């Protein structure tokens, strides 16, 4: 049995769940990996100069053992997130430390501690096998997966699974990720594939869509409501493009910050009206690497009020971090909220605390999403309320180049990777719904 036999079954219109269950699994499959013996290959280089094309490998690897509550999924398509870039350049730490720690948890998790790491935190594909105790999913189900992996043996995670002490990001802090022909997931990561999308379109939203949903919409994040003024940094990017869509769909007013006229046009195409091109308007929030410029915060706040009819910001959707955080705290209205999920420009934030405490503002840390939040975010995709931001698709062999392009910010929105799917455009099950939303689905294509 080969992966081609699996692909033939997936592409057959007549294959049943029993047919998929009867398929023999191959002994091995192709997967994107990094190697433990190469973690020092970029020592001494600046982050920008570390090249994922040198560290990312396409290897033939054995199919992992299937455990209770797990599934093996034939991966038709995946995508590249920043965590795969971090893994490939071994920053801020090597992910093999995560695998070693996870491997010590139980005899079953020891499978993850290997000299290679199969990466990737998104997938769209078809269930091949389920382990003991699985009732909700069966072979042949077309699925996407979110990337929250939890053990839930502690009481801490039963109010919000993101608080589970053994919470991990699949394909980053665990092995057997989605940039492969077969992936191993927990079945509480699975969600129905949106029927109107292709495999590569369905795979793309996962991590970033769920992250944006929790950070902006969920009660665990900013709990956005109708009429809120929402400042969105990087509003046309992988995270920001979903935040912009959520704000528009939820009746809020997104104030989109971008860095070029092209990116401003993408925001307009999504329906945004209030847009700030920070490069064109010359905002420099730091005089030098040690000193911020409050005058620039004030100029930025004045521009925001011009766009909102004199109102300040209710919610800031933060992820750049050090470069923008002082400005974010300043421009937020009294009693407003700054939510942060990343620090792409630097982890050590500085802000004037007087503008926080004396104005009763809140800073909320937000990290990925729990199963309910991820499911709700995917449900909005499936209903055509939120749309993929896929701009380009690579082959599995080209994953190194895809990661390089993301690392160097040469992309827009999300970039996809075909795994088992032989070409783009496959997997659509609801052509009528697709036709209704085709312009929005293709909004980021070839940008």
Swiss-Prot record:
It catalyses: butanoyl-CoA + NADP(+) = (2E)-butenoyl-CoA + NADPH + H(+). Gene3D superfamilies: Medium-chain alcohol dehydrogenases, catalytic domain. InterPro entries: ADH-like_C (IPR013149), ADH-like_N (IPR013154), Crot_CoA_red (IPR010085), GroES-like_sf (IPR011032), NAD(P)-bd_dom_sf (IPR036291), PKS_ER (IPR020843), Zinc-ADH_QOR/CCCR (IPR051603). Belongs to the zinc-containing alcohol dehydrogenase family. Crotonyl-CoA carboxylase/reductase subfamily. The keyword Glycoprotein does not apply. Inhibited by divalent cations (30-100%), beta-chloromercuribenzoate (85%), iodoacetamide (40%) and N-ethylmaleamide (80%). The presence of CoA thioesters containing 12-20 carbon atoms results in inhibition of enzyme activity. The greatest degree of inhibition is observed in the presence of palmitoyl-CoA and myristoyl-CoA. The branched-chain fatty acids, isopalmitoyl-CoA and isomyristoyl-CoA are less effective inhibitors of the crotonyl-CoA reductase. Concentrations of NADPH above 200 uM lead to inhibition of enzyme activity. Homodimer. Optimum temperature is 40 degrees Celsius. It comes from Streptomyces collinus. PANTHER family: QUINONE OXIDOREDUCTASE. This is Crotonyl-CoA reductase. Keywords: Metal-binding, NADP, Oxidoreductase, Zinc. One of its GO terms (molecular function) is metal ion binding. SMART domains: PKS_ER (SM00829). May play a role in supplying butyryl-CoA for straight-chain fatty acid biosynthesis. Catalyzes the conversion of crotonyl-CoA to butyryl-CoA. It shows a high substrate specificity for crotonyl-CoA, a short-chain-length (C4), but no measurable activity is observed with shorter (C3) or longer-chain-length enoyl-CoA thioesters. Its EC number is 1.3.1.86. It holds the Pfam family ADH_zinc_N. The lineage of its organism: Bacteria, Bacillati, Actinomycetota, Actinomycetes, Kitasatosporales. Optimum pH is 6.5. Disulfide bonds: none annotated.
